[in-house]
Regions:
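Short Fe-S-cluster ligation motifs
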Residues: 9-29
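Short alpha-helical scaffold segments that flank and stabilize functional sites
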Residues: 16-20, 86, 107-114
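Conserved C-terminal portion of the radical SAM core fold
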Residues: 27-29, 52-53, 80, 102-150
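Canonical radical SAM enzyme core domain
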Residues: 2-12, 34-80, 85-89, 103, ...
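Short glycine-enriched, charge-decorated loop/helix-capping segments at active-site entrances
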Residues: 2-4, 94-99
Length: 150
């Protein structure tokens, strides 16, 4: 686990991204979720500062979110949230032992309920069958993400 960067450092990086032509800037953390309320508040301030001062859109991938957290991010100017389902539901228990597929879906529901765009995909090539690849794609279709990273 890495410490969260300072607001000014993230802002400088977003400004640089905009300067070289990026239209989007994504704030990403490691771990299952943001553990400390103060860290979450700091991320909200990052989003707000970038959106108020720059012309770049802000996205994030921070792990599991409650509805309240998703709404707070949206209220501070976040556009899109990335939360991958990773694989077909039937394969998921074999690739992840820290949480279940329903935990992933709960965050996705919260993201959509807050009015954020959803970025949701997964990884191909983890030993899944052709049927599991199809299952994964059909599951993604039902989630209606704005973009799908594979």
């Amino acid at each position: 686990v890495y410490p969260l960067l300072a607001i000014d450092e993230v802002y400088r990086r977003a400004a640089r991204a905009q300067e070289i032509g990026a239209g989007y800037f994504c704030i990403v953390t490691s771990g299952r979720r943001i553990g400390e309320p103060k860290e979450f508040e700091r991320i909200c301030r990052m989003v707000s500062k970038i959106r108020s001062d720059l012309q770049i859109e802000v996205d994030a991938s921070l792990g599991e979110l409650s509805l309240h957290q998703a709404e707070a991010l949206k209220g501070n100017g976040l556009r899109r949230y990335n939360h991958n389902v990773e694989a077909a539901r039937s394969l998921f228990p074999g690739i992840c032992s820290t949480h279940n597929y329903e935990d992933r879906l709960r965050t996705i529901e919260n993201v959509k309920a807050a009015g954020l765009e959803l970025c949701c995909g997964g990884i191909i090539g983890m030993g899944e069958s052709v049927d599991q690849r199809a299952e994964f794609l059909f599951d993604l279709r039902e989630l209606e993400p704005h973009c799908i990273p594979i």
